[in-house]
């Protein structure tokens, strides 16, 4: 086997592992978002929607709701920052472990919807530090607007004769989030408030799986320091 062929095989395997991780984390995000929406009434990973909802609430005179949503936006930003700091200080998998702990804390906050809302958003921000790219291609985990946009632009270029098909992977986060949201809705219907324990356990299992990924591959899933 030539060196070049070996490198291609390793790259293909590394990309497959990265995409599987992206799909799993997006599934986790979709599940958490659906549970948050159905149990609290607001999105916990869709910040574009929360931005619009905050603006509408303020204009309609609902200052309390508007400020809560703005607080959620701030929490999402801080969660991203915390996730990156943990990822750099330790390993990207540590961010997943942190998210699992945050989700468990949120599950314990029964009767405190505002605190649970902010905690869930912070967790969804932090999870984005787990995977930022696949072989140099940016991917989103807890939001799919950008992924669908990149998919659409890639489709347009392909229709115009550009045969680079790397854009196809952008559909993976959407599929993961869609499937996860269905699961989250089913969990709320069947288990009510207990549903939130499932994302916490799922994040813990994801952490265990992520620790099996070779360390030398991990640098390909996050932006350079």
Curated annotation (Swiss-Prot):
Membrane topology type: Multi-pass membrane protein
Keywords, alphabetical: Cell membrane, Membrane, Plasmid, Transmembrane, Transmembrane helix
Principal place of residence: membrane
InterPro entries in UniProt: DUF1275
Membrane-spanning intervals of the chain: 17-37, 66-86, 95-115, 117-137, 168-188, 194-214
Cell location: Cell membrane
A GO term from the CC aspect: plasma membrane
Keyword match Cell inner membrane: no
Keyword Cell membrane: yes
Family in the record: Belongs to the UPF0700 family.
Stated name of the protein: UPF0700 transmembrane protein RA0705
Lineage summary: Bacteria, Pseudomonadati, Pseudomonadota, Alphaproteobacteria, Hyphomicrobiales
């Amino acid at each position: 086997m030539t060196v070049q062929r070996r490198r291609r095989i390793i790259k293909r395997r590394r990309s497959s592992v990265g995409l599987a991780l992206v799909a799993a984390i997006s599934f986790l995000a979709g599940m958490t978002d659906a549970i948050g929406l159905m149990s609290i009434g607001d999105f916990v990973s869709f910040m574009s929607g929360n931005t619009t909802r905050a603006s509408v609430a303020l204009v309609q005179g609902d200052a309390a709701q508007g400020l809560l949503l703005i607080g959620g936006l701030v929490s999402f930003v801080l969660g991203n920052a915390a996730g990156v700091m943990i990822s750099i200080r330790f390993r990207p998998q540590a961010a997943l472990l942190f998210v699992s702990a945050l989700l468990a804390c949120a599950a314990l906050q029964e009767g405190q919807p505002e605190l649970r809302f902010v905690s869930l958003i912070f967790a969804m921000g932090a999870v984005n530090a787990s995977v930022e790219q696949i072989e140099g291609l940016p991917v989103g985990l807890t939001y799919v607007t950008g992924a669908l946009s990149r998919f659409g632009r890639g489709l347009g270029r392909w229709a115009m004769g550009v045969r680079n098909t790397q854009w196809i992977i952008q559909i993976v986060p959407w599929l993961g989030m869609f499937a996860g949201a269905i699961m989250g809705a089913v969990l709320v219907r069947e288990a009510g408030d207990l549903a939130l324990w499932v994302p916490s356990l799922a994040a813990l299992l994801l952490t265990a799986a992520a620790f099996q990924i070779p360390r030398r591959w991990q640098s390909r899933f996050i932006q350079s320091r």
